[in-house]
Amino acid sequence: SSDLSVQIEAALSPLPGLVREVLAEVKCLGVGDNKNVVAELNVEETSHQEIQVVGNGEWCITMGGRDCSLQMHEQKLLEVSVIDEELVEQLDRLSPEDPRYSGLDTALNTLRKMEAEASRFGAAVGLDSVSTFECIVSDDEHYFMEMNTRIQVEHRVTELCYKLRFTNPEQADDYFEVDSLVELMVLIARHKKA
């Protein structure tokens, strides 16, 4: 091949032979001393979605997702809330024979998988603030990209859909609600266990 930098193959079955071919080609024709080869999964027709995660070091929860696929020059132009309740409501209005049903059902199951993964990840690292768990999504598959352990400017999209109620376990009518992620960060920082 004349282009040693990028080779995209559509099928996985001939992969071992293709890897040997690329390694031999790099060994013979590669420039310089660096003969490293990187193999990446080529994912097409994707969306960029992030899950809002909140934890205090002991517990970790998620607050839905945001689809931030519409971007230009690596800047997000539009963020759309992707929440379980909305997807369930849309599915309830459709019959399973409706052509949109399958796509919504896939989106709901993928969101639930991402939220469960994000919550496990946050709990595993002892997350003690707010973060976003970012993924590339293609149909019913999602691929973890990164965890941003800071507030993001688009956090207001989540705040429009969620608020948290903190209740005294000994007195159900003793509670307060938080609808600001920044306020929640301050509360967690002030009251987390040492």
Feature names for model-found ranges:
Residues 2-194:
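ATP-dependent carboxylate activation and anion-phosphoryl transfer catalytic cores
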